[in-house]
Amino acid sequence: MKEVIRTEAAPAPFQGAPYSQAIKAAGLVFVAGQVSLKPDHGEIVGDTVQEQTEQVLTNLRAILEAAGSGLDRLVKTTVFLQSLDDFPGMNEVYRQHVGDQPPARSTVEVAKLPSGALVEIEAIALA
């Protein structure tokens, strides 16, 4: 059985798209890709990849906490970057949030992200 996770502490699905912030199933939490949208105004926060990564991780944390999990329970993330030139800046912030046992991770350069975002992160965590 699956449980849909929703929280107002993170952005609602982008432009009303048909997806959930997260799904809890089989002892795991599957979090939809998050960009640096602020939940209260729905606009991208930050001009640098560091600022945007900070907001993305804030959004991920809020969703994971709503599911009874947290960043310390991450097992896999996928990072989408507008440019791999931003890899060091993203890593600088990411490292501060994932502790000394970071999750498995893939990082991919993409042609475009929603609303001109520089970074998007999706995640799987233990429930």
Per-range role (PLM):
Residues 1-58, 62-75, 81-127:
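N-terminal presequence-like segments and the immediate start of the first folded domain
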